[in-house]
Amino acid sequence: TPSLEKMEELSKFISTFGYIIKGDKEEVHPKALQGIIEKIKGKKEEGAISTIMLRSLKQAKYSPECSGHFGLAAKFYCHFTSPIRRYPDLQIHRIIKESLNNKISGKRQEQLTTIVDYASVQSSEKERKAELAERDVHDFYKALYMKDKVGQEFEGVVSSVTSFGIFVELDNTIEGLIRLANMNDDYYIYDESSYSVLGERTKKSYKIGDLVKIKVESVNVDFKEIDFEIVEKIEE
């Protein structure tokens, strides 16, 4: 279940678009979020709200406790199978086979409890490491791909806004950073509550979901960094 703090942040953000999350924020039901997803489908704010909603959810981890599945709104859930066999799947398969063959004694139950506790922690840690390694490889090849495109212009969507810059994702899923320090047309102030930046003098703003045209400013393959500069905001 998402934390109260994350749900309050999400609630405040979507309220600027005229949406509310029904029910108790401390025990939000998946159907409440599903209702928001259905309402925003096809609308210009869909991308922005979907992004923030996804970030408000806790990262999944393996656990020996039966804590259900928030996304499926399932009270009881077991990680049994997947397109690619994971170790937790195999561990559950072994336990089920033993159970069907009536081979789980009291002593074996204690052994399995220890095994499952360890397997849950180890599998969660290894999965995080695998995800980081995968992301690292993707970032390297994205930078390599963009190396010869410095100076070229593309259209993209603001995918994230931070205190130091604006991230823009292109149609080909490549993401680059527009550093606030390099935006010379104004001094931009970051507003954490609305995930946006606002120009102090011009009042020009950029927020998640905005369409923009960018120019590839620089690419550092070794550091896997792609820097953009803003050309213009595309008004819909």
Listing of model-derived features with the role each one plays in the protein:
Residues Y195-K204:
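A conserved acidic, glycine/proline-rich C-terminal tail/linker
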Residues T1-D171, L177-N184, Y188-Y195, D210, ...:
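Append "with occasional cross-activation on large, charged helical scaffolds in nucleic-acid assemblies
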Residues K204-E236:
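OB-fold/S1-family single-stranded nucleic acid-binding modules
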